[in-house]
Each structure stands twice: as C-alpha cells, then as structure tokens.
Amino acid sequence: MNEDKDTDSKKSEEYEDDFEKDLEWLINENEKSDASIIEMACEKEENINQDLKENETVIEHTKQHSDPDKSLQDEVSPRKNDIISVPGIQPLDPISDSDSENSFQESRLESQKDLEEEEDEEVRRYIMEKIVQANKLLQNQEPVNDKRERKLKFEDKLVDLEVPPLEDTTTSKNYFENERNMFGKLSQLCISNDFGQENVLLSLTNVSCEENKDRTILVERDGKFELLNLQDIASQGFLPPINNANTTENDPQQLLPRSSNSSVSGTKKEDSAAKIHAVTHSSTGKPLAYIPQPPLNRKTCPSSAVISDQSKGNGNSNHRAQSAHISPVTSTCCLSPRQKELQKQLEQKREKLKREEERRKIEEEKEKKRENDIVFKAWLQKKREQVLEMRRIQRAKEIEDMNSRQENRDPQQAFRLWLKKKHEEQMKERQTEELRKQEECLFFLKGTEGRERAFKQWLRRKRIEKMAEQQAVRERTRQLRLEAKRSKQLQHHLYMSEAKPFRFTDHYN
C-alpha cells in the first residue's frame, strides 16, 4: 500500500510539473505575441506618420504651384481690361486660357496618380516586410516535442466491469409469438382502391371463425402494424362500444362518424397520433373499412411511442405499452357532483392540516425561544456571580498586599513615596492653573455655545480636582494613623526592653 501511495504521489508530482511547464510556456507565448503586436502597431503608426508628412509636403508643393497660376490670372485680367479699353487693339484669344487650365488639371492628376502609386508601393513593401518578419518568427520557434507526455491521460479500458442486460424469458416469448402472428396476418393482406387512396384490408378465409372467436383487427400506428381486440379499441375511445355482431353489420355507416369523433377527442386528450385501418367482416362477406380523420397536431409524439422506445432501449421487449390503455390527463369536467364534493372536502382537509402544521411550528418556535431566554438569563446570572466573586477575591488580595507592605515598609522608602506624591500634586496644581488660564481666555469667546462648552469643561475639571483632593486627604490621614500606630508599638517595645533593677524606692522621702 505504501508503494502504491508513493507511485501515486510521484505521478501527481509529475502531472503538476507538466502543468506548471505548460502554464509557463503559454505565458511566454502570450508575452511574445503581445510584444510582437505592440511592435507591429508602433511600426504602423510610424509609417502612417511618415505618409501624412509626405502628403502634407505634396499638398504644400501643389499650393505653391497653384499660387503663381492665380497671380498670372490676376495679371491677365487687368491686361484684358486694358485691351478692351483701347479701341484700336483686338482682345486676346480665349483659347490660350483654356489650354493653360487644362494643362494645370492634367499636371495635378498626374501628381495624384504618382502619389497613389507611391502609396501602393509602400503598402506592398510594408506587407512584404511583415511576411518576412512572420517567417523569421516561425523559423525561430522551437519545434513541438511529440514525445512529451500531455496533461490528460486516458486508460484504454475505462470500464472495469461490464454487466450484460437481464433478459426476461416471458416477455421475449410473447414478443416472438406476436411476431409470428403478425407475419401470418401480413401474408393475408391485400390492397384495394375503393376510396381513392391506399387502404389496407384484411382478407380472411374463415369469416365465421373470425367473427365468433377472435374479433381482432389490424391497426397501423406510427408505421407499425398491431393486432388488437375490438373491445380494447372501443374502451380506448377509438370505436363505439360493441354489443354484438349484428349491430356492427346493421349500422356500418354510423361507425365512421363516431369513430372519427372519438379519434379526435382521443388526440386532444392524449396528444396521440394513430391511424387505424380496420376491416370488420359481416355474414355476407362484405368488407367494412374504418378510416379515422388525421390528428390535428402532429408535432407531439404519442406517449405510447415514447414509452415503447424507452422499453426497447432498456431491453424490455413488450410490443405494446400499457400507457395506450390509460389516458394521462385527469380533468374535472367528467366528475360527478358527488365526486366534486369529495374533492372539495379533501382540499379543505389538506388546508386544515397545513394550517395546523403551521400553527404547531409557530408554537414550537415560541417555546424554543422561551427556553433559550431562560437559559440565557441563567447563564448571565451565573456570570455575574462569578465576576462578583472574582472582584471580592481581588479586593482581599489587594488588602493583604497593602498590609504586608505597610508592615515591611522602610522609612527611606516612605520618604521617597512622599516626595513622589508631592511632585505629582505640584504637577496637578500646575495643570489646574493652566486650565484656569485657558478658561479665562475662553470666557471672552463670542456666542453661547463656546461659553456653555467652557462651563462644562470647568465643571468637569472641578469635579476631578475635588475627587483628587478627597483621595489625597484620605491617604494622608491613613498614613498618619499608621505612623502613630507604629510609633506606639516602638515605644512599647522600647519600654519593655529596658532592664530596670528591682529596688525599693520611697516616694514619701
């Protein structure tokens, strides 16, 4: 197992390495392509700028050429006027002016053609340069390594175990029997052109046997022929109910409209498209054909055809599906008043149950919320008790520490503490003095808001000062008491330690 795990880990590491290499290669290729695109864009911009500059120079040259022509025309016009004013001199020929204009237009057209040819040559040159660059890039690219392993690896055999489908012996036997019957019946079919179209008729030799025993007809449904019983078809709604053979013989014409109406209703309810070509044989031997109307909607396939295809795909060989007998649509139009009342009662019961369930859920949520509140309050009370206990213990420890410090305190240390406190008191006095000066400065502020703010700050500082003074007085009195107590203890010890000799003293002498 450990070896397999090692091999799997190695394979995964190799796969990750290949994936990282492929990613690096793709990133490098993208960077190269981006760089080449940027270079090409820069070159295009440079070429366009050069073309624009050349066009500007050409336009300037053409303007310069056109300016002298205009000046010449301007000079010619006063000359014409002079010529006209002189009565003895004849005017110049207007043909010379038109020739000059034509020559100027021809020169301009030639210059434009030259410019266009130069631009075309530049475009061709640019395209050839790009082709050469692309060929160089293709030559510089590394050849593709076909031997390198790819990221995805597929096994030759994806499925390890293949189980053959189960074969149902009974269904296969029924299928083969139906096929044999169908083959025997199809051999007896003949085609007649009585109604102007191809109708399949069943020619039976033994008419009496067919009427008395089988009473089956051949049905064509979606290109498949099936032998069905007349009672089954009548129960489905394709044919009217059959009581006996005489009724079918006496009323052959009533069969067509009823069956057509029933077929149309069947297509509306079940959305099925089935063509039934049936022949019923009377005692005289005259065939009677049943030709239903075509369905209204042929877009949707019948449910029986879908289920039959699924059964073939699954391996079941039932030739006829059971869904052909049962209509999938349940409409309330066919219900009786009693059934409608029962249905209403059932709906009311369902609504009542739903309301009760919602009410029960709401009550459960309220109960849970109440329980949670009780638990939270108990937890909060417990926490408060714990905090109070901790504070009590901390206060007792602080008192013990203070007592131990007072007993073991040194006079020099006490003097240092006294000096420190004095220094702190002096600092506080200085701060209070500065604050007082600031208050005096703030007193001259304009507006009520500044005065109110200053008054509030002054009150706050006064309270702080008062509390500090009270604390200092308490500390001083406590220290004085402790010092008096200690001095008494020292005096008592000194008095007891003195060794007085036992002697008689006469206080009266």
UniProtKB/Swiss-Prot annotation:
Main location: cytoplasm
Localisation per UniProt entry: Cytoplasm, Cytoskeleton; Cell projection, Cilium, Flagellum
InterPro entries with a match to the protein in the record: CCDC181
MF-aspect GO terms: microtubule binding
PANTHER family assigned to the protein according to its UniProt record, in alphabetical order: COILED-COIL DOMAIN-CONTAINING PROTEIN 181
Span list, region Disordered: 58-120, 241-332, 345-367
Stretches assigned to coiled coil: 335-375
Polar residues compositional bias, start-end: 243-266, 300-332
Amino acid composition bias (Basic and acidic residues), ranges on this chain: 58-82
Record keywords: Cell projection, Cilium, Coiled coil, Cytoplasm, Cytoskeleton, Flagellum, Microtubule
Oligomer and partners: Homodimer. Interacts with HOOK1. Interacts with HOOK2. Interacts with HOOK3.
Annotated family: Belongs to the CCDC181 family.
GO CC, alphabetical: cytoplasm; manchette; microtubule; sperm flagellum
Protein name per its UniProtKB record: Coiled-coil domain-containing protein 181
Domain of life the protein comes from: Eukaryota
Taxonomic classification: Eukaryota, Metazoa, Chordata, Craniata, Vertebrata
Purpose of the protein: Microtubule-binding protein that localizes to the microtubular manchette of elongating spermatids.
